[in-house]
Amino acid sequence: MPTASSKDDEVDLLIDAWSQLLPEVDLTPLDVMSRLRRAAFHLSKLRAKAFASAGIAVWEFDVLAVLRRAGTELSATRLITATMIGSAAMTNRLDKLAERGLVHRRPNPSDGRAILVAITPEGIDRVDAAMTELVRLEADALRDVSRADQALLASALRVLAAGETHEA
């Protein structure tokens, strides 16, 4: 087993071990994706912390943020599309958000079977506080990465995210 130097991290050790077991395999993708997965795990924890500081859960932020960015009321169908969750889950989430006074629902006058959802002033306060704290925490997490490297990383991740349709 390789010995960790001061610059080695868990991914370096993983790559070293696999390169000994499979020397003919280019492990560059594993190196990149393992670091990306670890970064995503840390980002998930940052998001939960930021949202908790504003008194909302991650799922609440997701719905409230869509409404906040829209700047107007949206149909439940539009919220389902934007958040990529099912209709039963959305109904449950909207019930809970309405109970907490974070959204208001009303019948859609042009379609009696549908509802329109609007974010309340309390919902705006919560989602704005959560976003402000999230950006602060993310900036702190990126403090050792130069602006130039952040731009390169964002560019590379944009390409990677667009590649989600290139499944093997």
State each model region's role.
Residues 1-54:
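N-terminal leader segment of winged-helix/HTH proteins
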Residues 30-33, 37, 41, 84, ...:
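Short amphipathic alpha-helical segments with heptad-repeat character
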Residues 37, 65-71, 158:
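Short, locally clustered residues in the helix-turn-helix/winged-helix DNA-binding domain
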Residues 57-58, 71-116:
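Canonical helix-turn-helix DNA-binding module
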Residues 60-64:
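Short alpha-helical "packing" element that flanks the helix-turn-helix/winged-helix DNA-binding module
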Residues 65, 92, 155:
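DNA-binding alpha-helical recognition surfaces that contact promoter or target DNA
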Residues 95-155:
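Charged, amphipathic alpha-helical coiled-coil/dimerization segments
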Residues 151-168:
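Exposed, interaction-prone assembly regions rather than primary DNA-binding/catalytic cores
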